From Swiss-Prot:
Record protein name field: Isoleucine--tRNA ligase
Motif ('HIGH' region): 57-67
UniProt xrefs under InterPro entries: aa-tRNA-synth_I_CS (IPR001412), aa-tRNA-synth_Ia (IPR002300), Anticodon_Ile_BEm (IPR033708), Ile-tRNA-ligase (IPR002301), Ile-tRNA-ligase_type1 (IPR023585), Ile-tRNA_ligase (IPR050081), M/V/L/I-tRNA-synth_anticd-bd (IPR013155), Rossmann-like_a/b/a_fold (IPR014729)
Cofactor note: Binds 1 zinc ion per subunit.
Length: 921
């Protein structure tokens, strides 16, 4: 007889190697064929809804690790909720308008000027949809479960129709108006540019220090005192309307050569030499806040220049007092509006001065730099001029410098409902908590929202103009345009004449002759995605507003979180979300931003081909995503190692229950041994902790909890000593069936707990466990937390035992290193105990040699009896010696009774009994 044939070795069809790159697409095809997404929705129909609303990625370019991080977090949440008693549909979306798509079309060599706007827009739409298709394939390959056949896409007619309604409702409430605001303007292209069309290059500019004389010091400064400003754009001096100082900085009045000057105290040391103030004396110090509304005179025009308080004035460079031209700068404009200054931008589209800048009419702005400095010198206001090289914005097409220039734009007034916005922010639950402060401060401090863009590819502003120039936005026109867009798409705006866009028979007092024109600007793309609560949450029957969760990168506080909040509060009075969760950015292994120039980009598509989607997903679960996260080949290697441990644990469990039927072979809890109960209690604790962590979106905690359970509780303890039972004992022995009961519970529980994170691997485990015709793991619910008898008492006892077991393991390791023993199975452990440890061992039941994975065990009372050589630590001493006896051929345990049965001279008594009873015919 071959004794090895009497061993009950593990058997499973679950392979050791995951082969994920090849296996995952097979599962995905099966899920699609079986309509798994729809089945999950059917299973959860009627349950409480939990709606995670997808922030739309931009439909341009290959998916990067940021996409993978974002979509995987969302998918884990939705899968968790779907297994936790909620109905949690997931509708993915895409943001499809805007400049990058126009640029991509231009790069293909399309001659934009040789076609109509409508034709150009059709090319943009086609390009956007191919990008959507490419990204959709990538997201599906990542294992993201959602309604991929019916996503929301911002260019679809039904979406645009709802966006028009949002605009109309805001206009109806008086929140939409036309005004002036500075934008990047390219004189060389004669057009406004978005930030994406700007590139920075070095440019040499005149750097000048200019004195503005005080005419009304408000009791703080004497008349005739000079406030000194610094600028690198002398050409903007003709548009100067004010000076900005920081309210929280200290400024000094100094006297030099009979003149008084005001500069920031912190900058005085550097300015003494630069401006020849070496001998200047400090007359007084004033706070920036005290200078608010002091009046100075423009250096060469007969008008006032008002001193204002603004945070953007700093003591980092210059003088601490900032020349302010509201028509030529973002900060200048915002503070100019706050102080009600004229928004003067005396340049035409080509960058040439108009008659609004007397003395410079018809001069190109760059040429005017020299003329302005000469004029300042002539009037005695120029204190210093030098040349500096600095990084300056250029038009990425023409490579020529751009300017800030105020032009007429459409705005959404934030002031009109700012208090409602702030109250809404306070009513939302933010994770991380700092998100609330961040958005609250942003909303509190933000100016009005410029919603118009002078571009072609976007949703048209649905505005008509009467003969007298009056803008027409009425319920009638808005509803009509909304329905036109719903039927034909927004291209109809560019394809039809005005009369064919207006409702039949439309009249307006401002157009006595019945003539109208239409707006040519489009909406800011943030208005597109910011309307999704109306176009998706409110419009789709399976969804609802407000959503339970918005979850995006931390850059979306100023983006989608902000625009969505603005439009939702404007039209509904409440936030579109109950909870907001944000994640950081994906950086390389050294914490650097990924970029092609650094050559450190890692693309999810490539990683999935090499390692599989479940490895990418496990990486996402392993990181503290609320901060910036790192990813590299080395980090993914570490994650793969954890995956391997989890997979091996599953394989061991599956292999050792191949002859186990839970219905007929399962052992009830009360009939289990204490050590088996202890493992089920630990498993139950894991269920509670993991479910709590899912609920708190703390996936890295789950990663560590499950990894720890598989590695420590199972691999290093229970599964290790179990081999002496499940391989060796008779198939139907009580102890073997008890351990198989625990194994079965463990594999079922772990598979369910891991399903949201590792959807492919857990499906494979589940199919191996249940067999042919198994219903998907993703149609199961998460395990419940059970109430197990005597759990506290059993846990306390066995936790204490595990600490002692650690000491025994250390002693065995020491003995191996000292060559006292080879394998631990050759050892005898003698344990010397006192006090609590003695009481503990008296109360424990079990085969301690088996539990310590040694051949022999002896318990001796009295630490004082331990020999010098014993390994000592709190309350116990461990002596390791070589076990006496022979090694049993079947179980490999060293026993004194080997050969007790003469028919089986190489077997111990236990093995001989098993063989005789169960294997001898």
């Amino acid at each position: 007889m071959e004794y090895k044939d009497t061993l009950l070795m593990p058997k499973t069809d679950f392979p050791m190697r995951g082969n994920l790159p090849n296996k995952e697409p097979e599962w995905q095809a099966k899920w699609e064929e079986e309509k798994l997404y729809e089945k999950i929705q059917e299973k959860n129909a009627g349950r409480k809804a939990y709606i995670l609303h997808d922030g739309p990625p931009y439909a341009n370019g290959e998916l990067h690790m940021g996409h993978a991080l974002n979509k995987t977090i969302k998918d884990i949440i939705v899968r968790y909720k779907s297994m936790a008693g909620f109905s949690s549909p997931y509708v993915p979306g895409w943001d499809t308008h805007g400049l990058p798509i126009e640029t991509a079309i231009a790069k293909k060599g399309v001659k934009r000027k040789e076609m109509s706007i409508a034709e150009f827009r059709k090319l943009c739409a086609e390009y956007a949809m191919t990008q959507v298709d490419g990204q959709r394939t990538g997201f599906k390959r990542l294992g993201i479960n959602g309604d991929w056949e019916n996503p929301y896409i911002t260019l679809l007619p039904e979406y645009e129709a709802e966006q028009i309604k949002v605009f109309g409702e805001m206009a109806k409430k008086g929140y939409i108006y036309k005004g002036k605001k500075p934008v990047y303007w390219s004189p060389s292209s004669e057009s406004a540019l978005a930030e994406a069309e700007i590139e920075y290059q070095d440019k040499t500019s005149a750097s000048i220090f200019v004195a503005f004389k005080v005419t009304d010091g408000k009791g703080v400064l004497d008349e005739g005192t000079n406030i000194v400003i610094w600028t690198t754009t002398p050409w903007t001096i003709p548009a100067n309307m004010g000076i900005t100082v920081n309210p929280d900085l200290d400024y000094v009045v100094i006297e030099s050569a009979g003149e008084k000057y005001v500069v920031a105290e912190a900058l005085l040391p550097s300015l003494r030499e630069k401006l020849g103030f070496e001998d200047a004396t400090v007359v007084k110090t004033v706070r920036g806040s005290e200078l608010d509304r002091v009046v100075t005179k423009h250096p060469f025009y007969d008008r006032d220049s008002l001193v204002m308080n603004g945070e953007h004035a700093t003591a980092e460079a210059g003088t601490g007092a900032v020349h302010t031209a509201p028509g030529h700068g973002e900060d200048d404009f915002l503070i100019g509006k706050k102080y009600d200054l004229e928004i003067l931008a005396p340049l035409d589209d080509r960058g040439v001065f108009t008659e609004e800048a007397p003395g410079f009419e018809g001069v190109f702005y760059d040429t005017a730099n020299k003329m302005v400095t000469e004029k300042l010198e002539e009037v005695g206001a120029l204190l210093k001029m030098e040349f500096i090289t600095h990084s300056y914005p250029h038009d990425w097409r023409t490579k020529k410098p751009v300017i800030f220039r105020a032009t007429a734009q459409w705005f959404a007034s934030i002031d009109a409902f700012r208090d409602d916005l702030l109250a809404a922010v306070k009513g939302v639950n933010w994770t991380p908590a700092w998100g609330e402060t961040r958005l609250f401060n942003m909303v509190r401090d933000r100016g009005d929202w410029v919603i118009s863009r002078q571009r072609a590819w976007g949703v048209p502003l649905p505005i008509f103009y009467a003969e007298n120039g009056e803008a027409i936005i009425t319920d009638e026109t808005i509803n009509h345009i909304s329905e036109l867009f719903r039927e034909h798409g927004s291209n109809v705006w560019f394809e039809r004449d005005v009369k064919d866009l207006l409702p039949a028979g439309f009249t307006h007092p401002g157009s006595p002759n019945g003539e109208f024109t239409k707006e040519t600007d489009i909406m800011d793309v943030w208005f597109d995605s910011g309307s999704s609560h109306q176009a998706v949450l409110n419009a789709r029957p399976e969804l609802s507003r407000p959503a339970d969760l918005y979850m995006e990168g931390s850059d979306q506080y100023r983006g989608w979180f902000n625009s969505s909040l603005t439009t939702a509060v404007a039209i509904t009075g409440e936030a579109p979300y109950r909870n907001v969760l944000s994640h950081g950015f994906a950086l390389d292994g050294e914490g650097r931003k990924m970029s092609k120039s650094l050559g450190n980009t890692l693309l999810p598509g490539k990683v999935i081909k090499q390692l599989g989607a479940d490895i990418v997903r496990l990486w996402v679960a392993s990181v503290d995503y609320q901060a910036d996260v790192r990813v590299s080949d080395e980090i993914l290697k570490q994650v793969s190692e954890v995956y391997r441990k989890i997979r091996n644990t599953m394989r061991f469990l599956l292999g050792n229950i191949n002859d186990f039927n839970p219905t007929t072979n399962g052992v009830s809890y009360e009939n289990l041994r204490e050590v088996d109960k202890y493992m089920l209690i630990k498993l139950n604790d894991l269920v509670k902790n993991v479910k709590d962590s899912y609920e708190a979106f703390e996936f890295s905690t789950i990663y560590h909890q499950i990894n720890n359970f598989c590695t420590v509780e199972l691999s290093q303890f229970y599964m290790d000593f179990a081999k002496d039972v499940v391989y060796i004992e008779a198939a139907d022995s009580h102890d073997r069936r008890a351990m198989q009961t625990v194994f079965y519970e463990a594999v079922v529980t772990l598979t369910k707990l891991l399903a949201p994170i590792l959807p492919h691997t857990t499906e494979e485990v589940w199919n191996s466990l249940i067999g042919e015709g198994a219903e998907s793991i993703h149609l199961q619910d998460l395990p419940d937390v059970k109430v197990l008898a005597d759990s506290e008492e059993i846990t306390a006892k066995w936790d204490a035992f595990m600490q002692i077991r650690d000491n025994v393991q250390k002693a065995l390791e020491f003995a191996r290193n000292e060559k006292l023993i080879g394998k631990s199975m050759l050892a005898k452990v003698t344990l010397y105990v006192d006090g609590e440890a003695k009481t503990l061992f008296d109360s424990l039941e079990g085969d301690f040699a088996q539990l310590f994975i040694v051949s022999d065990f002896e318990l001796v009372e009295g630490l004082e009896n331990a020999p010098e050589s014993a390994f000592k630590s709190n309350q116990v001493a461990v002596q390791i010696t070589v076990a006496e006896g022979e090694t049993c051929e079947r179980c490999r345990v060293v026993k004194k009774d080997v050969g007790v049965n003469p028919k089986h001279p190489t077997l111990c008594g236990r093995c001989a009994d098993i063989v005789v009873k169960h294997y001898e015919a």
